[in-house]
């Protein structure tokens, strides 16, 4: 499952990226992009109630602290509110929401007010093209600029610091990074949904390894639309494998360690998993756009329950989410980005 590290690449990879795809069939690339978009968004005919009586019998005790809706359009430079936001990064006490449909990043305060808008209006070099994931290393923001096959590194004020082309030489399509995680070593990982791979790079943008076969697969061989990524304290990577309905665990060197989850709409099953986050206790949180819930698993993959009711104490209450996608955990709080223009902040139970 692991491809040997590539050596001798230019750190930024931009020249290689320009040469890499001269023979790509444009129509084929567009078709693949459409398939990926459909798998990632899954926003058509979304349920307002959680399916499966078995699922509703397992409620994880997280409490809603804040619900932030789209800022008023009249306070934004473009005059448009959120358009399918996809992810969030928490940097200190600062919240950065990736507003994918508008190709911009919004910094919000804790009440949802817009503090700054990061896009080409703020810096002409900040050209986002359908970016789907954002993360932080504690100092900088990292953005998976999906439509440009690259990862951008930005200051919290939006100034571009680095730009890394991503992808494996010889793959049939340009990379489409839709998941992103940053290690405490300075390495970063991306999921390439176009070529069914997970890629790890060092801080200079050199490819360290590539996991996956380069085609749709399952089991230990590979992925079928890899998406959200998270790292545990040991440096193991957790990969959301959307169309296989599972989460795959990889060692720091890319070796396959195991998986959990299965396709379905009952307890512990995953219908359209999107993103993953891990708390300090090692519990794994997986957003599911079709179940309109966040499923929770223990460090040993034991199913612990779901988050998704307006009132966790009332199993008959309505659904909290419509299309949960991007996740982040900071301290004892879980941040959930809903594609229907909302951010939810939840207090997690004390797991010490």
What does each of the following model-derived ranges do?
Residues 2-352:
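Eukaryotic scaffold repeat domains enriched in small/polar residues
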């Amino acid at each position: 499952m692991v491809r040997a590290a590539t050596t001798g690449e230019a750190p930024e990879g931009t020249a290689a990226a320009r040469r890499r795809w001269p023979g790509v069939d444009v129509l084929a690339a567009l078709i693949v992009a459409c398939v990926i978009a459909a798998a990632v968004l899954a926003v058509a005919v979304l349920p307002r109630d959680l399916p499966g009586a078995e699922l509703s019998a397992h409620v994880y005790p997280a409490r809603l602290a804040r619900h932030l809706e789209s800022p008023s359009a009249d306070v934004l430079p473009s005059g448009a509110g959120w358009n399918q936001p996809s992810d969030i990064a928490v940097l200190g006490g600062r919240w950065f929401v990736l507003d994918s449909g508008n190709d911009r990043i919004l910094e919000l305060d804790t009440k949802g007010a817009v503090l700054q808008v990061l896009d080409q209006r703020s810096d002409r070099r900040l050209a986002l093209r359908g970016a789907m994931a954002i993360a932080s290393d504690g100092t900088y923001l990292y953005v998976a600029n999906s439509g440009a096959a690259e990862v951008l590194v930005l200051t919290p004020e939006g100034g571009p610091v680095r730009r890394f082309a991503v992808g494996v030489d010889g793959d049939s399509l340009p990379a489409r990074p839709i998941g992103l995680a940053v290690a405490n070593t300075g390495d970063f990982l991306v999921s390439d949904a176009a070529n069914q791979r997970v890629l790890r790079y060092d801080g200079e943008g050199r490819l360290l390894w590539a996991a996956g076969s380069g085609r749709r697969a399952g089991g230990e061989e590979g992925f079928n639309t890899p998406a959200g990524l998270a790292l545990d304290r040991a440096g193991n990577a957790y990969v959301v494998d959307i169309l296989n309905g599972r989460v795959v665990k990889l060692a720091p060197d890319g070796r396959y360690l195991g998986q959990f989850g299965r396709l379905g709409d009952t307890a512990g099953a995953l219908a359209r998993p999107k993103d993953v986050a891990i708390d300090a206790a090692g519990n794994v949180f997986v957003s599911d756009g079709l179940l309109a819930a966040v499923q929770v698993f223990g460090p040993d993959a034991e199913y612990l329950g779901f988050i998704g009711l307006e009132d966790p104490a009332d199993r008959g209450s309505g659904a909290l989410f419509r299309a949960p996608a991007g996740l982040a955990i900071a301290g004892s709080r879980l941040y959930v980005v809903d594609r229907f223009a909302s951010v939810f902040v939840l207090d997690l139970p004390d797991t010490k």
